Amino acid sequence: MVARHTRSLPGDSGILAPPNDLHVNQTAGWIVLGLVSVALLTTLVSAVIITRRDRNPLFLLLLISGAVLFPFFVEPAGDIILATWYPPDTPAIAATILGRHIPWFVVIGYAAGIPVACYAGYQMITAGLEAKRLLLALAAISLSEGVIEMAAVHFGFMSYYGNHALIFGVPLSSLVQNA
């Protein structure tokens, strides 16, 4: 079990120190990395097909933004604000930014998921789908993201270590923010 920390890092203006007792099962880590890689390959093939078919680079540009902006800019800042931690022994760390480890499964997961969700939303809006259906689609995406985070916390791939109201290990604020 991950210990909850209440102390701050020296000189960090109240930023909570991350846990040092969280470890990842290496085999499970590599399996997750493989699964998100298959998802990325599917997204990449879809991006090429859709870009050629529609002669519109939007899907491909969303894939690039999902691979660059979210994991390397949004994720590290959000991890500090929400007191989120990926263990340093996670297989295949892509980068350490602002003292936060960003595993490749996070980078690849963003690259695989962001373009699909955004492009699907774009297609629904341009097709004139009513707001009720758009909100239902958003709810489905948000719920699936919540379940993925709950599983990641349960299996030790990540931890929320602040003083949060938790739902199956995930802060209520994170579930709302991901919506």
List each model region and its residues.
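Aromatic-rich, lipid-facing transmembrane alpha helices and their immediate juxtamembrane interface loops
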Residues: 1-179
